[in-house]
Design a protein with these regions (language model features):
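Asp-based phosphoryl-transfer active-site loop
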Residues: 1-10
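Short amphipathic alpha-helical segments and helix-helix/interface helices
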Residues: 13-21
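Asp-based, Mg2+/Mn2+-dependent phosphohydrolase catalytic module
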Residues: 1, 14, 25, 30, ...
C-alpha cells in the first residue's frame, strides 16, 4: 500500500491495514517518499521508504522484493496505489493491483479481494 495519495485519504483508508492484519494477512507500506509518520508505519508489518532496497516504484523488482519480505508470493499480494505507473509495475510483478481514486470504491475492492469482513 502507498502512503501519499492513498493512506492520506482518510480514516477508512488508514483502517485497511489493520483490517487485513486482523484477518491474519501480512501488510506492507511501500512509499517513494523518505518520511512517513511513525503512527502510520506501525500499522504495517514491513515498511519500505525511498530507495531502501535499491530500486523505486514502479520497478517490478520493488514489488517482488516486498512480497519476499512478507514471505508471500507476488500473485497472492494486493497492492494499492494512486498512480497508474505504480499499478502497472505491481501487475508486471504478478500482483493484483488496485488504482485508488475513491475511498469507498477502494475500501470495497480491497475488502472483496482480501475477503475481509464488512465494516
Amino acid at each position: 500500500m502507498d502512503y501519499g495519495g492513498v493512506l492520506t485519504d482518510g480514516a477508512a483508508m488508514l483502517a485497511l491495514p489493520g483490517r487485513a492484519r486482523a484477518a491474519g494477512l501480512p501488510t506492507a507500506l511501500v512509499s517513494d517518499g523518505n518520511e512517513v509518520p511513525d503512527a502510520v508505519c506501525r500499522l504495517f508489518d514491513v515498511v519500505v521508504l525511498g530507495a531502501q532496497i535499491g530500486a523505486r516504484k514502479p520497478d517490478p523488482d520493488v514489488f517482488r522484493r516486498v512480497a519476499a519480505m512478507l514471505d508471500v508470493p507476488p500473485q497472492e499480494c494486493v497492492m494499492v496505489d494512486d498512480l497508474a505507473r505504480n499499478v502497472r509495475g505491481a501487475r508486471a510483478a504478478g500482483m493484483v493491483a488496485v488504482q485508488h481514486h475513491d475511498v469507498d470504491v477502494t475500501v470495497c475492492e480491497v475488502g472483496i479481494l482480501l475477503d475481509l469482513p464488512p465494516v
